[in-house]
Amino acid sequence: MDEDRFTYAVTDGWLRDLASEPTQYDAWPCVRWDDRLLADQIQFLDVQAELGVEYSLAWGLFIDRSWPVPFESVIDAEREKKLRIFADAAHERGLKLLHGTGIYSWGFDEVIRKVPGVSAGSAQAMCLQSAEAWDWQRRVLDFLMDPQWGLDGISMQSADQGRCECPKCSKLSPAEHHTAILVKSAEHVRAGRPDWVIGQASWGLRVDEPSELQHLQRISKVVDYMVEVRERSAEIGRRSEIVKGLACAFGSVGGVFVEPPQHWDRLRWFVPCGLGSARALARLWADGGRACEYFYRPFANPGEEVSWRMGARILSAPKTKPEAALREALEAVYGVSGAACETLADWFARAEAAYFSRSNFAVGHGSLSLEPLIWKENPAVPGPPVYLRDRMSPEGRAEYARELEALRAEFEKMPIPNAEARRRTLAAIGGTLQEIASLA
């Protein structure tokens, strides 16, 4: 095992999470693949290759919520063309492309509605006991393993939408249940594509409970890596112990990341989080963690590119100090150097603390949602700024606004060689201040 870098440095997300343009009036997840998005993806691959993040893991290459019934004509010729361009571009840069894959849930809504016997009552999860359910899961895996798509592996998720709770399935603990379907799926993939990387992300599945370790160990024997979303194992001091007990690499989602808001203009927010993420990744490395699924960011927002670059640098060079990763990212995004870079680095650190010191969000708890992922009042329009409304008191928001105004005034006086990055940063700060004012 390479001890100079994370073994599985994966950047991931839904197809449009890195898009420079929002889809304001589409329900989440929108997987529209146009030429502008393809250009954004190629740009992202360039930065990914520059920083040595080997794997790109995409959800939504083929579907949004459900595989079709009957299982045919999954994508049209134009989408297949874009997929080939994307896969070829990744391979030309020495990168590998993974597919985000639901196991028994996520991707099977239409199957459950139309195919008798795959579910025992759940509208979102198929039943472990059903032969018809396995037949559909196997079809999906066989489809993905077809070499024509240019994929290099999968990351499996089985728990973020719950599980079957029929009398037979409910006799199993959550970990037992998910282990059964994950191991069966991974073994099928390993037999069909021994060259593939197989990951597993524990959205909705706890990995920190001592009684469940035996089940995690079974999973670890058939996958290459697994990641814990909320870092409970670190919070209770068990992560190092868990790492030592597994046969695969173990990791996280990088401590903190801003969940890219599908419906929002890319300059509507300014929430740097790179130091929090870099420090969390350094702690993961110290605990023996060697895997991370580090989420896509839209580089149209300079603060997001800086944050992503910082975590990516830790993944490829874990002994890098977070502050050094920040300076390197600022040089790349803003074109600053020397004393100007030091000044901007201090400014960015204060900008990050300005939000997180007043917010009830805790690093290690996964994603920070700016808008509701699915706004129940209207899922196809931009949602309210819940990262401000629900995570800060009115007094905290007022203090935050005053500090942002002071930071903006400082930034306006700084010499920034990249004029476009400067303009976009000021616009993003302005967007945040408008949000705060709307909540007053």
Model-derived features: positions:
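Glycine-rich, histidine-containing beta strand-loop boundary motifs that form or position
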Residues: 57-60, 99-103, 157-158, 200-202, ...
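Substrate-binding groove of N-acetylhexosamine-processing glycoside hydrolases
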Residues: 1-4, 9-10, 27, 37, ...
